[in-house]
A protein has these predicted regions:
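Amphipathic alpha-helical packing segments from all-alpha helical-bundle domains
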Residues: 71-76, 116-141, 146-153
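C-terminal peripheral helix-coil segments that are non-catalytic and often amphipathic
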Residues: 1, 130-141, 164-209
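Short, basic, alpha-helical segments at the C-terminal edge of helix-turn-helix-like DNA-binding modules
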Residues: 65-71
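Hydrophobic alpha-helical connector segments
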Residues: 62, 73-104, 141, 148, ...
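Outer-membrane beta-barrel translocator/channel fold
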Residues: 154-162
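Short, Lys/Arg-enriched anionic-surface-contact patches
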Residues: 6-13
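Helix-turn-helix
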Residues: 16, 20-58, 62
Length: 209
């Protein structure tokens, strides 16, 4: 669906373009995210988008930043809820895997790397880094901070790899398609249990004082 308005502010134009790029990414893959295609979606000219983003690579970098921010914000909220026992760890795993698979983040990352546009992935890495820093800051012990970093690395790399060749690999090994998600879930459950145990130990120690 095209978005057509005679006048948009610069911020509105950028937002509309990035949202159109996200939809194109999901519908047709990263190769479809071009200035011309996005311009057609929002009723703007190629020159207009060139002014805002500089190039197709600039548009893709803005899209990557948008995906990184939205994905980490959603996952961060889910992690907080899981720490409170309000949602199952599997939800966090599914959100992460779905973002890289159906959400197109994995395909976009591979496309950028293959086209030599590695810098465009910096916003995604930085968004994940900010989320990890936020989670580590609330860890009860340094060891738990390390567990958070380890699990973040595991979860992101598993989700990225699964989005690229999870289906063929699972099939060739005679494993269920969901196996990678199950592995990630087990690791995340162990991390949350370790955090809960540390919290209980801290509360018990405080009660003795």
């Amino acid at each position: 669906m095209s978005i057509k308005r005679s006048r948009l502010s610069p911020d509105e134009s950028r937002h509309a373009a990035v949202e159109a790029a996200r939809i194109l990414l999901i519908e047709a893959g990263p190769q479809a995210v071009t200035l011309k295609a996005v311009a057609g979606r929002i009723g703007r000219t190629h020159a207009n988008l060139l002014h805002h983003f500089g190039s197709a690579a600039g548009l893709q970098k803005a899209l990557a930043a948008h995906l990184g921010d939205t994905i980490t914000a959603t996952i961060g909220e889910a992690v907080d809820a899981a720490r409170r026992g309000e949602v199952a760890p599997r939800l966090i795993v599914d959100m992460t895997f779905d973002a890289f698979d159906a959400g197109g983040a994995g395909a976009l990352a591979s496309w950028m790397l293959a086209s030599g546009n590695e810098d465009a992935l910096d916003p995604v890495v930085e968004a994940i880094h900010r989320l990890v820093d936020k989670l580590v800051a609330t860890a009860l012990t340094p060891d738990l901070g390390d567990v958070i970093r380890d699990n973040t690395l595991m979860l992101v790399l598993l989700a990225l790899g699964d989005s690229q060749m999870g289906g063929p690999m699972a099939s060739s090994l005679g494993l269920p398609r969901e196996k990678a998600r199950e592995i990630a879930t087990r690791s995340l459950i162990a991390a949350l249990m370790a955090e809960a145990a540390a919290f209980a130990a801290t509360k018990a120690a405080q009660a003795k004082v």
